[in-house]
Curated annotation (Swiss-Prot):
Residues 336-346 have a biased composition (Basic and acidic residues). May be involved in the remodeling of cytoskeletal components, such as alpha-tubulin, and in this way regulates neurite branching and elongation, as well as cell motility. Residues 4-280 form the Protein kinase domain. It catalyses: L-seryl-[protein] + ATP = O-phospho-L-seryl-[protein] + ADP + H(+); L-threonyl-[protein] + ATP = O-phospho-L-threonyl-[protein] + ADP + H(+). Residues 299-346, 359-393 are annotated as: Disordered. It comes from Pongo abelii (Sumatran orangutan). It holds the Pfam family Pkinase. PANTHER family: SER/THR PROTEIN KINASE ULK4 (PTHR46240), SERINE_THREONINE-PROTEIN KINASE ULK4 (PTHR46240:SF1). Belongs to the protein kinase superfamily. Ser/Thr protein kinase family. APG1/unc-51/ULK1 subfamily. This is Serine/threonine-protein kinase ULK4. The gene is ULK4.
Amino acid sequence: MENFILYEEIGRGSKSVVYKGRRKGTINFVAILCTDKCKRPEITNWVRLTHEIKHKNIVTFHEWYETSNHLWLVVELCTGGSLKTVIAQDENLPEDVVREFGIDLISGLHHLHKLGILFCDISPRKILLEGPGTLKFSNFCLAKVEGENLEEFFALVAAEEGGGDSGENVLKKSMKSRVKGSPVYTAPEVVRGAEFSISSDLWSVGCLLYEMFSGKPPFFSESISELTEKILCEDPLPPIPKDSSCPKASSDFTNLLDGLLQRDPQKRLTWTRLLQHSFWKKAFAGADQESSVEDLSLSRNTMECSGPQDSKELLQNSQSRQAKGHKSGQRLGHYFRLENPTEFRPKSTLEGQLNESMFLLSSRPTPRTSTAVEVSPGEDRTHCSPQKTSPLTKITSGRLSQQDLESQMRELIYTDSDLVVTPIIDNPKIMKQPPVKFDPKILHLPAYSVDKLLFLKDQDWNDFLQQVCSQIDSTEKSMGASRAKLNLLCYLCMVAGHQEVATRLLHSPLFKLLIQHLRIAPNWDIRAKVARVIGLLASHTTELQENTPVVEAIVLLTELIRENFRNSKLKQCLLPTLGELIYLVATQEEKKKNPRECWAFPLAAYTVLMRCLREGEERVVNHMAAKIIENVCTTFSAQAQGFITGEIGPILWYLFRHSTADSLRITAVSALCRITRHSPTAFQNVIEKVGLNSVINSLASAICKVQQYMLTLFTAMLSCGVHLQRLIQEKDFVSTIIRLLESPSTYIRAKAFLVLLYILIYNREMLLLSCQARLVMYIERDSRKITPGKEQQSGNEYLSKCLDLLIRHIVQELPRILGDILNSLANVSGRKHPSTVQVKQLKMCLPLMPIVLHLVTSQVFRPQVVTEEFLFSYGTILSHIKSVDSGETNIDGAIGLTASEEFIKITLSAFEAIIQYPILLKDYRSTVVDYILPPLVSLVQSQNVEWRLFSLRLLSETTSLLVNQEFGDGKEKASVDSDSNLLALIRDVLLPQYEHILVEPDPVPAYALKLLVAMTEHNPTFTRLVEESKLIPLIFEVTLEHQESILGNTMQSVIALLNNLVACKDSNMKLLYEQGLVSHICNLLTETATLCLDVDNKNNNEMAAALLFSLLDILHSMLTYTSGIVRLALQTQKSGSGEDIQAAEDLLLLNRPLTDLISLLIPLLPNEDPEIFDVSSKCLSILVQLYGGENPDSLSPENVEIFAHLLTSKEDPKEQKLLLRILRRMITSNEKHLESLKNAGSLLRALERLAPGSGSFADSVVAPLALEILQAVGR
């Protein structure tokens, strides 16, 4: 099963997501729709209708899958978005463009109708654009076969999925709402209840053409009933472009629309008239004219026939069926009919249940999108995001200007979590209040519950209010009367907690009476309880009428607090009520958006609250005052502006720093945060008074909620430039922010990313510090946590938005960093003594190179930053490094030798990281060959051993990658060009240096030889270059020097290279033999085989086996070559040519030492690896054919036992035959071997079992061979 890589999300619906994707192992991009399984009927319908359709104006279906949680639909990727998006962006399209788009629509729909398919729900969001502007029909969820009942089909699929047909009627009823499309484009007859038809689809096309030209559909209304009435009764207005400067509609276009938008389907244009219409300017002149309904039916019948038949017979069959009165919808072929839904199943039903992990999430970050994907009516809006058009635009696609970036950032400064409002009154975090209780026995009025009060009739409500007011207004002549009044007030506290009751009581005469008693009641207990009732009413009321005397209450409460300011208990009673009233006025004013003069209250209220904040007050009073400011400043109102003073920031900061209760500390900093939302100078005043270091220390040591508010404060201040230069230069501040990325709180991490983004926008150098502090690691961690396709909680969604902006900025910043580095190097290029300005520039820019390394080693950034532009810049930097290394340019004096070496090392390391991911270089092969490899080749000549080795390693590995990569369609020519450039580079520059490179200490020869291996394996012509460069003797010298470490990298490369050279048909074998190829192979094979046969030495066994196979491959090529020469000599012997015979004899003489390997090859035959047996047996066969039984140890007792074991254990007749032929050749060419066989009892028994008449099945070739050998030994 092949997996898919998912890239960015390009569309989303309530139950579906569309991703841009790629099949793993290919470069073919597709659109992948992931949908909930509840959408199975729609998706199944899409698949069964389109699975075999191939048309340029219809989105191609590829395949579909079912995993444990989702259905996955893989279709053609359209890169131009939807027609709806185009219309929305351009508002209206010129008539020429409408014609071009219309031709695509007509072509696609005509093809569908010829197949008997009705699209049914044609709308702009279901029409997608391919790159060059071709329109394609997509989303066939609601399409159907003509004459079919789609509700029944949906119910059938759903019932099948449910495991039976129980409740089928219920299913059909539930499907009615699912088969309805967009009413805006629905034909009048369908609105009346008729079935969809060819004619209704043509009406929808007319609506589309109208909307493309005018920018709006012919009929539109927010009200469904009004829209229906317009479609059924009104004629569309003439199409007029939104842009008045555009030309009016032509008479042809108007006539076409009139024909398509006829309410009577009988008068509507048919296919024949539509295709011949003059508006198309004969675009369909060569089209198939079988476009009437009858012709469409004939076309379907033709398609339904399963075998090759004469066209006349098909026509006769069609006519005979028509004569019998069959309707087109009754002649559905197997192509579309789905009476048994199991006929179409996603792949999981055939291949076992699949895991969601078959669709792998790319490391690439996922952009958030507001578009949706349609898989059912009213749910989705299809959208496909553009693909990259060229490598150079990979980064710039979706590039944000700094203005747009900061605009999006400002929207993220404050979240709902930062602006949560909690009650001021009865807030347990401020002060725990005793529970409110009342005694219904002494209430003297009905103790209605809240539910009862809500349903009182007006008269009963008025009576109830009158009773309440009467009791409150009664005089307190005795203690009993006071208790009764307090009891009533407690009852009011209970019912005031309900919003609707509180709203009615606040706007009743009771509220004025409560204010009066708050002023005149002689008993402070009653005053306190009255204040509490007022506060609860203000806290729970939902609206405020302008004639309600809230300002009077605020003034009164202010006076009472001011007159009794030293009475802390009284303040604790009155402050919450004052705060709730002020907050009520502020919220209502914010709703109404205009300040109300009737709600203006005196400055004394602000003064009193500010005094309550000051040092020396009880913490409860401080807390209440801070809470009031926190709530009021959440609103944008005149009341909030009253708290903005020069001292408010430091006062709240003092409360935060000197309070021990976390709840008060949180309230104080939250209030400061909300004031800063109105005026950033409030936090600026704090920093100026207490110092930035003190604020940073507080941020580092605070609890999570405080850290969230403080990060918001810093973000708000940075967004408006306050203390900007100081903050972006403060390394301790940046380090503290990065440490907060370890917080468990999603909001804190998101805000930390946002603060860092502000810093990086204005100080690029801080990106280096951030990377060194593991910023990239934190980004990768949080990118993995945010998985596309899942419903995200608000915290994760917020984190995703902040993270996306930071990633996009860093990706956009990298080219600028590289540009600065290039400029600084270009300015000093060729100079021995840079100027002071140039030195300063080098010191500022070159140390930023580690940023590149951090980004290319990140799975999030690497796919986005490695572009053609990046590789070109990187190659240019390498060219400057070559100049520095050669001494042509001197930067050591400017930045120091250590810094210079570090810069070169990091630059080379960055490319080393990139080549670990070959797919990144696939599209940029020519850029790498033309701009990166040349300076690397030059660095191979460096006097610095480290750079020489590093560059050779990079060169070797890069070349191996490039020559082994495959290219898709259209890339062959570029591949050939880059291959020729690569070959020329190595031939002209690198190979001449090999004479010195191969004699250097390890591991230099290993990398040099690895490059030769890759080139000779990929390009046979390179073999001649190796020979012409006189490298063969050097290669054998390397072999002699490294023979002791046969499993080392150098020897592995040597053997691989020799294998390529010997296997090449154009290779000069004479040269290889002259340099001692035979003796080297004998020695290497002997040593390697000994390692493989040593049962006690299991270390490096796999490596030795791989090496042995390569050596046997070389031996086989040598013997095959020799055998060919000998065969050629024997063929020419009759002609009397002595040269060929002499050459064959000389070659046989050269190869004679190889016969010593026979006694080594035989023990290798029982090897567990079948490939070892295969090549060993072939080598042994050719050796005995060429030299017979020359090796005296060929049939030693040990080897005889091996042959006996093999003939017994091997069941393949071909293998048995080969072994028997080897034995026969040995005994017929050497008497000694014949005598050895006579005494080999086990081998003779094995031969007897293979001979005819042994009682077992005998192969027609194997048995005679076994019999022949037995007869030779006299058995």
